[in-house]
Curated annotation (Swiss-Prot):
InterPro entries: YidC/ALB3/OXA1/COX18, YidC/Oxa/ALB_C. GO terms for biological process: mitochondrial cytochrome c oxidase assembly; protein insertion into mitochondrial inner membrane from matrix; protein insertion into mitochondrial membrane; respiratory chain complex IV assembly. Keywords: Membrane, Mitochondrion, Mitochondrion inner membrane, Transit peptide, Transmembrane, Transmembrane helix. It comes from Homo sapiens. The keyword Protein biosynthesis does not apply. This is Cytochrome c oxidase assembly protein COX18, mitochondrial. Mitochondrial membrane insertase required for the translocation of the C-terminus of cytochrome c oxidase subunit II (MT-CO2/COX2) across the mitochondrial inner membrane. Plays a role in MT-CO2/COX2 maturation following the COX20-mediated stabilization of newly synthesized MT-CO2/COX2 protein and before the action of the metallochaperones SCO1/2. Essential for the assembly and stability of the mitochondrial respiratory chain complex IV (also known as cytochrome c oxidase). GO terms for molecular function: membrane insertase activity. Found in a complex with TMEM177, COA6, MT-CO2/COX2, COX20, SCO1 and SCO2. Interacts transiently with MT-CO2/COX2 during its maturation. Interacts with COX20 in a MT-CO2/COX2-dependent manner. Residues 189-223, 284-333 are mitochondrial matrix.
Length: 333
């Protein structure tokens, strides 16, 4: 009953170092046209929202200032209209920052997935050894269970260290992408309302004529709701594509999926009340996110990124997604 772990052999029962008691569980505007009215929180100076509050602090924070300078720099360097500057900035940031992090996330998750057979083997052997020791020493079921859990956590942690693939590393994308999304949204809000910026009003005037198509005024909400609905639809597509690829989700994963679906729908009315510049950024960001999600399912791109092959990989991922989508939403009676 030997399992190899990082070049070292797990010894038989006497050397497993099992502990039975006192085991703490580790916590696993266009001219001549009337512009739509923005809600107070979207147009008022930041100080009017909440004096000395978190909103004011965040809107005037250094990261938001940096995001403003990035947007202004791209606009000045390219000479593009503001809708183009927003689009280009979004694509550049997502491509330079979040795409590598997303590839790293898939790399870590692939290594964790490839460890599952070894983890199952260790779990089976450890369970047998704990059962033997429990019979020898007369442990209660509770003591035996705590002993198993403590040692299983230790052994799994050793595997993660050995292969340098702790699952927490896969969350780095969220910790970078979410703050970046918030800072860019606040920066566009400041520029669109003339708040908290020395050149705010001149930029606001440029944004008022910097749109395109049905949203020429980027400082006003999209009265047609096309942009807000598009944001919601793309976000829902991302959620569903991720959900379709997961088989046998845990209860927690199911709750998270429903929560993200609800947030995607809730974002639609929220997006209908903020300046179109912000919603355009949200739309571009979501579209790039969807594109990255699909790109990272390509076997060729995964190989280019040196993402390990796993049992769940498919040679035809896009056909599989379409087939699963068709089965779940179109062919369902």
């Amino acid at each position: 009953m030997l399992c190899r772990l990082g070049g070292r052999w797990l010894r038989p029962l006497p050397a497993l170092q099992l502990w039975a008691r006192d085991l703490p569980l580790a916590p696993v505007p266009t001219s001549g046209a009337k512009r739509p009215t923005l809600p107070v929180w979207a147009v008022a100076p930041v100080s009017a929202v909440h004096a000395n509050g978190w909103y004011e602090a965040l809107a005037a924070s250094s990261p938001v200032r940096v995001a403003e300078e990035v947007l202004l720099g791209v606009h000045a360097a390219t000479g593009l209209p503001w809708w183009g500057s927003i689009l280009l900035s979004t694509v550049a940031l997502r491509g330079a920052v979040t795409l590598p992090l997303a590839a790293y996330q898939h790399y870590i998750l692939a290594k964790v997935e490839n460890l599952q057979p070894e983890i199952k083997t260790i779990a089976r052997h450890l369970n047998q050894e704990v059962a033997v020791r429990a019979n020898q020493l007369g442990w209660s079921k509770r003591d035996a269970r705590l002993t198993y859990l403590k040692n299983m956590r230790r052994l799994i942690s050793e595997l993660y260290v050995r292969d340098n693939c702790h699952p927490f590393k896969a969350t780095v994308l969220v910790w970078i992408q979410l703050p970046m999304w918030i800072f860019m949204s606040f920066a566009l809000r400041n520029l669109s309302t003339g708040a908290a910026h020395s050149e705010g009003f001149s930029v606001q005037e440029q944004l008022a004529t910097g749109g395109i198509l049905w949203f020429p005024d980027l400082t006003a909400p999209d009265s047609t709701w096309i942009l807000p609905i598009s944001v919601g639809v793309i976000n829902l597509l991302i959620v569903e594509i991720c959900a379709l690829q997961k088989i046998g989700m845990s209860r927690f994963q199911t709750y998270i999926t429903y929560f993200v679906r609800a947030m995607s729908v809730l974002m639609i009315p929220i997006a209908a009340t903020v300046p179109s510049s912000i919603v355009l950024y949200w739309l571009c960001s979501s579209f790039v996110g969807l594109s990255q999600n699909l790109l990272l399912r390509s076997p060729g791109f995964r190989q280019l990124c040196r993402i390990p092959s796993t049992k769940s990989d498919s040679e035809t991922p896009y056909k599989d997604i379409f087939a699963a989508f068709n089965t779940k939403f179109i062919s369902r009676k």
